[in-house]
From Swiss-Prot:
GO terms for molecular function: chitin binding. The N-terminus forms pyrrolidone carboxylic acid. This is Penaeidin-3a. It is found in: Cytoplasmic granule. The modification Serine amide is found at residue 81. The modification Pyrrolidone carboxylic acid is found at residue 20. One of its GO terms (biological process) is defense response to bacterium.
């Protein structure tokens, strides 16, 4: 079993050294996906920002957080601005 693992490692290392795997030269690390955002009460959320689409049903602290982080501020009777 160790022999098989060793041979697979050597074969993959040889391909990398010959440039068969990464033909573009320097390769950047793959970016991490954004963290999972839990939906807040009050409706669907916007893309990756964690703030509901409407101002209805969110707490004061959630509204203040969306306003300070993203500039999406709730106004009484008007909904979001910004």
């Amino acid at each position: 079993m160790r022999l098989v693992v060793c041979l697979v490692f050597l074969a993959s290392f040889a391909l990398v050294c010959q440039g068969q795997v990464y033909k573009g030269g320097y390769t950047r690390p793959i970016p991490r996906p954004p963290p999972f955002v839990r939906p807040l009460p009050g409706g669907p959320i916007g893309p990756y920002n964690g703030c509901p689409v409407s101002c209805r049903g969110i707490s004061f602290s959630q509204a203040r957080s969306c306003c300070s982080r993203l500039g999406r501020c709730c106004h009484v009777g008007k909904g979001y601005s910004g």
